[in-house]
């Protein structure tokens, strides 16, 4: 799903495609680390949030930075606030910003929208 979505997005003619990805569970991230890394090399910019643990503890000793290390140019940020600030400072008109993952990463979309709207209204 990740690969198919990102490949399709890259063909849509946007200036730049951003993928904000929230890994879901430590076990799944450990098992699919290389697959996630290959998919996250597709967009122009990948932002990786902290792993959403759900009910797990990190017995796998895996972190978002492990995934980020496999994706050249990616940025690992722990909080949605940090992600929002980074995107709002760096994204440009004509860019596509996707939120992807099995958790609450969708909340970033609304946060980014609100911050960009505020920035536009207070130029």
Predicted regions and their residues:
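ATP-dependent carboxylate-amine ligase
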Residues: 1-123
């Amino acid at each position: 799903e990740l690969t198919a979505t990102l490949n399709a997005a890259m063909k849509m003619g946007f200036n730049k495609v951003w993928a904000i990805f929230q890994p879901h569970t430590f076990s799944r991230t450990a098992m699919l680390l290389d697959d996630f890394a290959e998919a996250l090399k597709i967009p122009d910019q990948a932002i990786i949030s902290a792993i959403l643990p759900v009910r797990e503890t990190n017995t796998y000793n895996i972190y978002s930075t492990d995934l980020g290390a496999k994706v050249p140019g990616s940025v690992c940020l722990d909080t949605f606030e940090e992600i929002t600030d980074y995107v709002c400072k760096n994204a440009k008109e004509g860019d596509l910003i996707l939120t992807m993952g099995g958790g609450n990463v969708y909340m970033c979309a609304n946060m980014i929208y609100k911050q960009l709207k505020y920035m536009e209204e207070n130029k």
